[in-house]
UniProtKB/Swiss-Prot annotation:
Domain of life: Viruses
Record's protein name: Uncharacterized gene 93 protein
Gene name linked to the record: MDV093
Length: 147
């Protein structure tokens, strides 16, 4: 008899269109140590889906809450936000890695890639994704917000 419940990396979505985003709206991984790898998988999937994304990693999950999304509390929050924007025809967009260091409020930005991209679904103009640790042994939960 197969074990019940989620298993680490049992579901690796290839985010290529709106429907796939909805399919992956919320799930939990058992292995909390994989949180960064899992978020990286989604970031890579966003890259493969031919959209523009920016990633922000911060300690305070409430600093940039999801718009029209669920409010998620965490004992030891670690959030990753992706914001996907409809690109301007005349501009290059960069992926932005924004790190927050404790309560110091200091941030550093590192542009890791820049390229012109086209939308497969131009009606989707912004997406916000949050990957969040929810405490030891509980894995992470991911939620999406479209606005």
């Amino acid at each position: 008899m197969a074990p019940s419940g989620p298993t680490p990396y049992s579901h690796r979505p290839q985010i290529k269109h709106y429907g796939t985003f909805l399919d992956c709206m919320r799930y939990t991984l058992n292995d909390e140590s994989k949180v960064d790898d899992r978020c990286s998988d989604i970031h890579n999937s966003l890259a493969q889906s031919n959209v523009t994304s920016s990633m922000s990693v911060m300690n305070d999950s409430e600093e940039y809450p999801l718009i029209n999304g669920p409010s998620m509390q965490a004992e030891d929050p670690k959030s990753v936000f992706y914001k996907v924007r409809k690109p301007d025809r005349s501009r290059d967009f960069s992926w932005q890695n924004l790190n927050s260091h404790g309560n110091s409020g200091l941030r550093r930005e590192k542009y890791i890639r820049s390229s012109k991209r086209r939308w497969k679904n131009p009606e989707i103009f912004k997406v916000s994704l949050k990957c969040e640790s929810i405490g030891a042994g509980n894995g992470i939960k991911i939620s999406f917000s479209f606005f």
